[in-house]
Amino acid sequence: GWDTPISTQLPEFKLRDYQGSQRVTVSDVLSHQVGLGKNTYDRDLESNIPYPLLAERLSNAPLACTPSECYGYQNIAFSLIGDIVFAVTGDFYSHQVETKIFSPLGMKGATFGRDALMANTNWARPHVYNGKQWVARTPNENYYHVPPAAGVNANIHDMALWLNAQLGHRQDVLSANL
């Protein structure tokens, strides 16, 4: 459930505060309330340091608060959800999402990975401001190494199907307690 401590599925998960590590729940991970500061280790991810090493390094990361007490957007910590999915199902996050969400909802354009994104001729590019204007950039491949945080691509039609399910209109896919 949402309130299950992730240490029950990932005993290797540690934060700098061991007791805090034992209290981090699935809900904390999904709501970016693990206790870490914003974007912990994103620069290392951008530098192509492998996700498993970054997840292990969370044990040394400074904490901004105790778990559940503050919000700090995460890519590395959020991606622990993929490890939890694998521990529970024995299957990869991307496959579980494809079979349990994309397919039943009819999200035919939804994909995982940068290659799938760039193979499509019609997609919104990320932009950065260079001090004078907004400039389009190519997505950083390294973020696609953490599919739970940054690996999904979806068009507006697929997003409408997803929103409809979140609003409770597809309880065959997303139950009411979600």
Label the predicted regions.
Residues 17-178:
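Short, surface-exposed loop or secondary-structure junction motifs
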